Amino acid sequence: MTLEEFSAAEQKTERMDTVGDALEEVLSKARSQRTITVGVYEAAKLLNVDPDNVVLCLLAADEDDDRDVALQIHFTLIQAFCCENDINILRVSNPGRLAELLLLESDAGPAESGGASQPPDLHCVLVTNPHSSQWKDPALSQLICFCRESRYMDQWVPVINLPER
């Protein structure tokens, strides 16, 4: 590996870390503002009703999910819809970290019936614009810029890895 190749690889790694940090910040703010929709079915309903307010679509799958044909069909349809409606898409390669970000300790707890509750479907997460004010968030702007740059390089659904904490 030449020095130039090493430098380019290092810059790409740093950029991915920055994008991952920006995504964490966006998810944290959206979670506190309750502008997140979680689940493939719930996301499809929202996209059908109000696609103009969706600013970001996250698709999360691990290696086991890659063999789930039904999930991959859902992903393909959601990706096509998002591309058609100019909604930014990111694919998250570590859904476990995404679950940590979205399901904090306060949300977790035993079901009232005494049994374990069904974990929510985190394969698709939508972030919407709050109706009260237009987001002027630098982290969201950074994600949108990253998605746009990826599309210019013909990478329509860039894959990012959320940094572990």
UniProtKB/Swiss-Prot annotation:
GO terms for cellular component: cytoplasm; nuclear speck. Interacts with AURKA, PCNA, GADD45GIP1 and MAPK14. The keyword Phosphoprotein applies. Belongs to the GADD45 family. Pfam families: Ribosomal_L7Ae. It is found in: Nucleus. It comes from Cricetulus griseus (Chinese hamster). This is Growth arrest and DNA damage-inducible protein GADD45 alpha. Might affect PCNA interaction with some CDK (cell division protein kinase) complexes; stimulates DNA excision repair in vitro and inhibits entry of cells into S phase. In T-cells, functions as a regulator of p38 MAPKs by inhibiting p88 phosphorylation and activity. Keywords: Cell cycle, DNA damage, Growth arrest, Nucleus, Phosphoprotein. Gene3D superfamilies: 3.30.1330.30. It comes from the Eukaryota.
